[in-house]
């Protein structure tokens, strides 16, 4: 029987891992990449490309290497915990080389349309029209994996800023920013306090005369560096923390997070504290912003009410004159124009079962991969989504009925609306552990900790108390990897390796990823469970 042919659209992080997922399931992938190279979002270019997010030269990733790596290919131990964009791209190149993925990619090939075949209701096949060097080609595929991400179109809401058309200075979207040199001696407003807005305000403040950071709601600021110098996502992404937060509820979880973030600086005193709770908005990751604010080089302002030719008037009535540049760090929107009516996007919202499958298709042969804004790393989520989707394509897994899928989609949408402030960026939110555990269940790779308590207690302890790293989903089930156990047990070694560039005497009182206090919490947790059951 001939292998099923699967079209993979995009050769960024999601596309690369989906090629590998296809190969693992015995499917034949054909990947179409509109540019001439892999990497997607993480490939820096001086000139921005339409339809693709464009990063600035200094970007450092916000998730640590142990949490963002693909599950069976750890990032080298000498790489820094938070990598520069060039190192992220290099990791993707190593991954592609290790698993021989490049030969399945057709570069400089644009996908023009993806349409159902006339017999789709029985075959589930798709007609894919592509264009390369001015020539169009039509192919038929048994399945399609869309891996174009959610940073496709710059969101520039100029209609919300009256007078911008009269402004005589320069204004542009953050996707066009590359480095701070051109802002030397200028007065700059950065609108938006997401990750890009915070980064740009900090970087530009090193050359500009003055930077103003304008925000409608304020934000909670999360450090990359957590207690004892460990990456913050390693400390927050443990199963014990996850289980306890589910028992304690959102209020206590918010209290804990806000206390942690206020320990470094008082968000109210710095003009950043929002009305909403910490977990009602995607946190802004930035280690340097409070330093620039306390030095007076960045001034936090409210929302801009209107612009004049040379000034900005804010909603609190204050005014800043002599403004030279306005940068809109207002995020991105996403669309799938090549899919026509198969997947409809309305106000940055899309109906997808588990954020992957359109519920209205007669055959589940189309999947959207990586369309999620997680509180954590996206790469391992895309990988698990790809593992699940290829199992469905192969017929190894089944989806519920359309009505059941729609009911779950609506429920998830209602829960999201209750939790998050109304914002374009919160339409595709997802918690890291929630998402990983849910999809791992569907794939059949969620670690079963209870038996390990008796057969491998050391590993069980790490799974419960340590960070919930992607490699944990290679311990058992389909795609099991022999190196998974060792990789989990040596996580802390790889965290420490790039930091130990000078030999010092190890202090036994120093911190570790699994502390005595966390161990006591685990004992208390199990005591409660035993008391109830």
From Swiss-Prot:
The modification Phosphothreonine is found at residue 284. Induction: In the gastrointestinal tract, expression is induced in response to a high-fat diet. The keyword Transport does not apply. It catalyses: N,N-dimethylaniline + NADPH + O2 + H(+) = N,N-dimethylaniline N-oxide + NADP(+) + H2O; NADPH + O2 + H(+) = H2O2 + NADP(+); heptan-2-one + NADPH + O2 + H(+) = pentyl acetate + NADP(+) + H2O; octan-3-one + NADPH + O2 + H(+) = pentyl propanoate + NADP(+) + H2O. The modification Dimethylated arginine is found at residue 5. It comes from the Eukaryota. SUPFAM superfamilies: FAD/NAD(P)-binding domain (SSF51905). GO terms for molecular function: aldehyde oxidase activity; flavin adenine dinucleotide binding; monooxygenase activity; N,N-dimethylaniline monooxygenase activity; NADP binding; NADPH oxidase H202-forming activity. This is Flavin-containing monooxygenase 5. It comes from Mus musculus.
């Amino acid at each position: 029987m001939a292998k099923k042919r699967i079209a993979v659209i995009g050769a960024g992080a999601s596309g690369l891992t989906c090629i590998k997922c296809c190969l693992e399931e015995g499917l034949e992938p054909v990947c179409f990449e509109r540019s001439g190279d892999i990497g997607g979002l993480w490939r820096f270019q001086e000139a921005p490309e339409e339809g693709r997010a464009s990063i600035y030269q200094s970007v450092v990733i916000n998730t640590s290497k142990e949490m963002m790596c693909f599950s069976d290919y750890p990032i080298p131990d000498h790489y820094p915990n938070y990598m520069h964009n060039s190192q992220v791209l290099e990791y993707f190149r190593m991954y592609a080389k290790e698993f021989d993925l490049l030969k399945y990619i057709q570069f400089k090939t644009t996908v023009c349309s993806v349409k159902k075949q006339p017999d789709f209701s029985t075959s589930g096949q798709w007609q894919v029209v592509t264009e390369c060097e001015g020539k169009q080609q039509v192919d038929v595929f048994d399945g399609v994996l869309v891996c174009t991400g959610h940073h496709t179109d710059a969101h520039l809401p100029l209609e919300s800023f009256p007078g911008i058309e009269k402004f005589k200075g320069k204004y542009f979207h953050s996707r066009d920013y590359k480095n701070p040199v051109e802002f030397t001696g200028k007065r700059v407003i950065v609108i938006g306090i997401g990750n890009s807005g915070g980064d740009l305000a900090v970087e530009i403040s090193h050359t500009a005369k003055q930077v103003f950071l304008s925000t409608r709601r304020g934000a909670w600021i999360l450090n990359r560096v957590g207690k004892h110098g460990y990456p913050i996502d390693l400390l927050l992404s443990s199963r014990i923390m996850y289980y306890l937060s589910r028992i304690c509820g959102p209020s206590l979880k918010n209290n804990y997070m806000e206390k942690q973030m206020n320990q470094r600086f008082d968000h109210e005193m710095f003009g950043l504290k929002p009305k909403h709770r910490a977990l009602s908005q995607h946190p802004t990751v930035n280690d340097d912003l409070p330093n620039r604010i306390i030095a007076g080089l960045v001034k936090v302002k409210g929302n801009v009410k209107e612009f004049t030719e040379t000034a900005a008037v804010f909603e609190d009535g204050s005014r800043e004159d002599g403004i030279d540049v306005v940068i809109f760090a207002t995020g991105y929107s996403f669309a799938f124009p090549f899919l026509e009516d198969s997947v409809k996007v309305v106000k940055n919202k899309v109906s997808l079962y588990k954020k992957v499958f359109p519920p209205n298709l007669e055959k589940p042969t189309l999947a959207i991969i990586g369309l999620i804004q997680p509180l954590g790393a996206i790469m391992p989520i895309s990988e698990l989504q790809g593992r699940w989707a290829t199992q469905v394509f192969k017929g190894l897994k089944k989806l519920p009925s359309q009505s059941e899928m729609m009911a779950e989609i609506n429920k998830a949408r209602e829960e999201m609306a209750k939790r998050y402030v109304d914002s374009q960026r919160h339409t595709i939110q997802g918690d890291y552990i929630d998402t990983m555990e849910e999809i791992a269940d569907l794939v059949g790779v969620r670690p079963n900790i209870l038996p390990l308590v008796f057969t491998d207690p050391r590993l069980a302890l790490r799974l419960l108390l340590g960070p919930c790293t992607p490699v944990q989903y290679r311990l058992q089930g389909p795609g099991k990897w022999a190196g998974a156990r060792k990789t989990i047990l040596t996580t802390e070694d790889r965290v420490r390796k790039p930091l130990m560039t000078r030999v010092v005497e190890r202090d036994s009182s120093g911190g570790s990823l699994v502390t005595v206090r966390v161990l006591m919490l685990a004992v208390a947790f199990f005591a409660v469970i035993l008391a109830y059951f």
